[in-house]
């Protein structure tokens, strides 16, 4: 028998994912918990960020959604927005106080995620907001190394213009230049 979480609001959760703005507003007005975390630790804000639901993200923020909640793997809504390349959502999350240097359970940051996928507009926003360009994850990779691994030339150029350290070594003694 599956035990149902009494705090879970499927209507609200699905409305956030599907971008049903009127339903999201209605559910918030009816008392939906904007910071509820499911079994994986994910929130409605993470779900809306992942699905590029700009209006839903903003109404969640306006109603107290915590931008720095992390899921069971340490991922935040900011990391999701950076990975998806949604500059508007990324800026809204940063403006709401998201930690641009938060790390997931593998030590990866939103900047590293954006660099791996070549999301240059998000890379610029994160750097402008104070993201540390030379942070390294648990295997020693930096944002520059991630961009190099993925052959993201424009991202590499952008990081070099912003003084990314080309001499950092990962845990295997490899630099971004190797």
Residue ranges and their predicted role:
Residues 1-30:
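Intrinsically disordered, low-complexity regulatory segments in ankyrin-centric signaling systems
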Residues 7, 39-40, 72-73, 105-106, ...:
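Ankyrin repeat start-site detector
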